Amino acid sequence: GNIERRTISMPLSRGNYRLIISGPAGTVFIGEQKEGVTGLVIQKYTLDKREAKEFISGAIQVSVSNDGNKMLAKVGSDWKIMNTTSATGSDAKSVKISLKTHLDRSAEWKQIFEEAWRYERDYFYDPAMHGRDWNEVYQKYAPLIPWVKHRTDLTYILDQMNGELSVGHSFVFGGDYPEVDKPSCGLLGADLVPENNRWKIKRIYTTESWNPELSSPLDRPGIKMEEGYYLVGINGKELTAADDPFQFLDGALDVQTTIHINKTPDFKGSWQEVVKPISSESNLRQRVWVEDNRRMVDKLSGGKLAYVWVPNTSGGGFVSFNRYFFAQQDKKGAVIDERFNGGGLLDDYMVDLMNRKLRAAITNEAPDGVPFRLPAGILGPKVLLINEMSGSGGDFFPWVFRQQKIGP
């Protein structure tokens, strides 16, 4: 008893600690995620000495035996076993695992489907199954199972069956998928359109040049590049509108690549620029979409309204809200955009900030001076944009927005 009174602090340095496992008497193993290290760095903490020393590094999975004397760890692709009583895991011995099994995939997929159906039948919180005849649902989807030829097909059917309940936070995860090579096609962070039998650079996407995820490879210091120029070649090969530019960029991911640029649709007279194509344009295009929306709201309102995008109700959403909400306190009102909101927490933080009322102000006697107001924020009217693509906390956010009478 009184376990809370037997709690002691462990004087560890700051770190991203992801795991703690008890070891032999008087020791604890702590897993730390360090920057640039694949897997966890496992430290052995000794209670009597109040110190931690590195035991093994690069552990992906870790388990300690019930008696605390042995540790099994997956390091890279190898499984290793070691004595926990040693100062380090240097005595680790590799465990050879060469297990093979023969599976009847069709029978396995049928079993998975039926078990998933039974899980919902037996454990769904509402015995009435949200008004659905669950046996009827089985008869609807079961005939599709013999036609499944890939795990993706099965996952799609499970998703559709699950969707019959019209309930949130009921997901389909996992599955054995074939291993395939990762795409190595590089992207330029730009819109290319065919024109004059060439690929014209219609738009270069960039927002924050200091952020590698939010800047186009074509928008780097020292590169002679403008929207409206033509991409006429890649790595010495001439490129026409009949060619797929992404085929030319296959294998160029994170590799210095020579592109040929011209103001006119001609290969002759073009110049070369060296760029490093990126793996994804998602964050870049998303930020540009947000900034385009902000500029549009500012233009249509004559500079009176702010635009605040809330991508989710978790960390990223709070960062975006704080960034756009408090930076536009001079606006008379705000358009809050939570379309495509990915959810997270049941928000009260953002709603509470938007529900603030003016408490006080400090006058500013300078010519055209703006009074300093308390509390901080946009205190004028607000409207919330929503769509059907939000979920979880993204569903609760609009409800509480209206419930608190912040706006429509």
Model features per residue range: what roles?
Residues 2-15, 46-60, 87-105:
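Multi-bladed beta-propeller domains
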Residues 3-7, 11-45:
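Non-catalytic interaction/regulatory modules that flank or connect domains
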Residues 13-31, 54-74, 108:
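Conserved beta-propeller blade repeats
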Residues 37-44, 76-85:
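Structural motif
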Residues 91-169, 195, 199:
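Terminal targeting/pro-maturation regions of precursor/exported proteins
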Residues 121-123, 208-218, 232-408:
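Cleft-lining beta-strand/loop regions that shape enzyme active-site pockets
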Residues 146-200, 267-275, 280-293:
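Extended, small/polar residue-biased N-terminal targeting/export presequences
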Residues 182-241, 391:
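PDZ/PDZ-like domain segments forming the peptide/carboxylate-binding groove
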